[in-house]
Regions:
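A short, exposed loop/beta-hairpin motif centered on an aromatic-Gly-Thr core
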Residues: 27-41
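Short aromatic-glycine-(Arg/Gly/Cys) micro-motifs in beta-strand/loop hairpins
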Residues: 9-31
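Short, mixed-charge low-complexity intrinsically disordered segments
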Residues: 53-96
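Short, Lys/Arg-enriched N-terminal segments with co-localized hydrophobic residues
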Residues: 1-9
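Generic structural motif
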Residues: 19-21, 39-41, 78-80
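Short amphipathic, charge-patterned alpha-helical segments
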Residues: 44-49
Length: 96
């Protein structure tokens, strides 16, 4: 079981921004930010979508749109050395 614990610690971290849309484009009238540990960008979005209560679909590259809502998400991989700088840069960032 020690090996399993090591594998869990090695999961990549993803930075996710969730914001409103206007005319189909990201609007940033409001924004929620998350740091998510997951095996892949898709896995990170599954966790974030479950946490925020939306069903989402990938619409290309790093963008995901909420189904039936004017909300979109952007996902990017975070280098482990930069995680603390994200926490310092954004005062309201949730860790999932």
């Amino acid at each position: 079981h020690q090996y399993r614990a090591e594998v869990v610690r090695m999961k990549p971290t993803y930075f996710i921004e969730m914001t409103d849309t206007f005319g189909g484009e990201a609007n940033y009238c409001w924004v929620n930010r998350f740091l998510v540990s997951a095996s892949s960008p898709r896995g990170a979005m599954r966790r974030a979508a479950k946490h925020t209560g939306f069903n989402v679909r990938n619409v290309g590259c790093d963008r995901w749109d909420a189904v039936g809502a004017c909300v979109c998400y952007f996902v990017e991989w975070v280098d482990p050395a930069d995680i603390q700088s994200y926490r310092d840069k954004y005062s309201r960032i949730e860790v999932i």
